[in-house]
Amino acid sequence: MGLSDGEWQLVLNIWGKVEADIPSHGQEVLISLFKGHPETLEKFDKFKHLKSEDEMKASEELKKHGVTVLTALGGILKKKGQHEAELKPLAQSHATKHKIPVKYLEFISDAIIHALQKKHPGDFGADAQGAMKKALELFRNDMAAKYKELGFQG
C-alpha cells in the first residue's frame, strides 16, 4: 500500500501549491466537505449554524480551522508514511474528544481531491490524483488502526 518515491514527489509537489495559500485551500476543502456531507457539520459546534456557502465563505472561524486541518495534514504527508509521531495525538483527539468516524476521514479526503482538482486543474492530473488518493488512503488506514487501538469503533 506504500507509495513509490515518484508518487510521494507528486504528492509533495501539489502540496507545495496548497502551502502557498493554505487559508483558501482549507476553506475550499471544508466547504466542499460540508456541502457534500452536511451531516459532518454536526461534529463542529462552531460551524453548525452555517447553512449557506456564502455564510461558510464569510466565516473566519471556518477559514482558521481549514488552516489547522491542512497544516496538520501537510506535516503528515511530508513524513512520506513515517508519520507515527504526528498521527498518534491526532487519532487520540479525533477518536476520544471529537468522535470523528473513519467514514468522515474518507469524506474529507474526497473533499481534498475535489479542492485540488478545482484550484489546480493543470497541475493535478491523473498521476498526481492517484498518488494523492493513495497517500490519503494510507493516512486513513493508519488513523483507523489507531482508533482501534484506542477502542473507538468510529
From Swiss-Prot:
EC number: 1.7.-.-, 1.11.1.-
Entry binding sites for nitrite: 65
Subcellular location: Cytoplasm, Sarcoplasm
EC class (word): oxidoreductase
Highest taxon of source: Eukaryota
An example Gene Ontology molecular-function term: oxygen binding
Residue list for modification Phosphothreonine: 68
Leftover remarks: Marmoset, woolly monkey, and squirrel monkey have a minor myoglobin component that appears to differ from each major component in having Phe-Lys preceding position 2.
Subunit structure: Monomeric.
Protein name (Swiss-Prot/TrEMBL): Myoglobin
Record organism: Lagothrix lagotricha
Gene: MB
